[in-house]
Amino acid sequence: MRVTTALKRLLDLSGITVTEVDFQLSKVVVTVKLRSGRLRCPECAFSTKGRYDRRGVASSWRHLDLGRWRLEVRATLRRLRCPTHGVRTEGVPFARTGSRFTRDFEDLVGWLATTMDKTAIRRLVRVDWDSVGRIIERVMATGLDPNRLERLFVCGADEVSWRKGHSYLTLVSNHDTGKFVWGAEGKDTATLDSFFGELGEERSAAITAISMDMGAAFEKSARKPGHATKAVICFDPFHVVQAGTQALEKVRRSVWQEMRKLPDQNAARRFKGARWALLKNPGDLTDDQSATLRKLKRRGGDLWRAYALKEALRAIFAGDLAEDEVGMLLDRFCSRASRSGLKPFVTVAQTIRKRREGILAAVRLGVNNARHEGLNRRVRLIINRAYGFHSANAALALIMVTLGPINHVLPHERAKVADP
């Protein structure tokens, strides 16, 4: 068997003929030519037999490694004039538009990025992280289910931080599938407006319920004409409990600042170490943390009252209570919090009273962001695993290829290219 024939079978790329093979010190260079007589625009479906000029464009792509050798595919491409996109270098069937990697290589990297950290990927495939990010963006652009916004009846909208410094992504999930179906940079009304704009009025009107946090931005967007005006707004109990936890943290900080002014600085340091004992659920406490809580209870004061309020609010949603029971307990909590004299909890009570209907709707319909929050926890793991991103688009792409509706097909799982 000739070397060119062997490499043709090993490459398993469609629409090419191998014309030359060059074994170099650290890589194998395979020169190919396209078999098709028609030139295809890389941006659209337009094709033509006519060349724009006789100039050839030398191009190369990184392919899957051949053992320890890098494998590079080279070809001289032709140029065409597309009526829509103007003069372009012809597209190739084995690589995505604008890429210097073959589709097989990118599909492998895209799958690896869902399971491995940055350092491991760089070592295995021998490309820098910025290149990995751009590969993932291309995999997302071509691999996401094009019908992911169809039959979207119950969804959740939430924001997640992708980088320190108030850098956020808004993510929309389908509660029925447990997958992210849309995402964009930002967390304001205009960001969610973009989602409804892409969804269109007809599909937006089909949404029956949408869960979100208790901020005003997402609700304002959902209630705009042409958006989800008929959907029931459900304020997620997770965020209600989170509001109580954040209020407790504000009280703790205030008390800690007061203790720092005392002559005994050791007391302030010991008190600062009580943070996790206060924030964790009672069932998750260590023995030392339980002992810390007992000391705080004996001491009493604002901090213990704040902790008791936080736990009272958490307990309302810890069980499977009916809507009327939750409503009664929320009213009781709000009354207690309003009389507490603790400003952060007074604010929480005001917010709950204002959002009461949406909170109870979430309980009544069983619609909440619990599954979405589970996705958000996985998002944070993804972000930590990647050690940062060069752009919001890169972060969003990795999130979507990992947690979105995409079917990863590895090169060996794809149907083999038939020999000519």
Predicted segments, located by residue:
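Tryptophan-centered motif/residue detector
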Residues: 58-61, 93-97, 129, 182, ...
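Short, polar/flexible loop-turn hinges at active-site or ligand-entry regions and domain interfaces
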Residues: 95-96, 230-233, 255-259
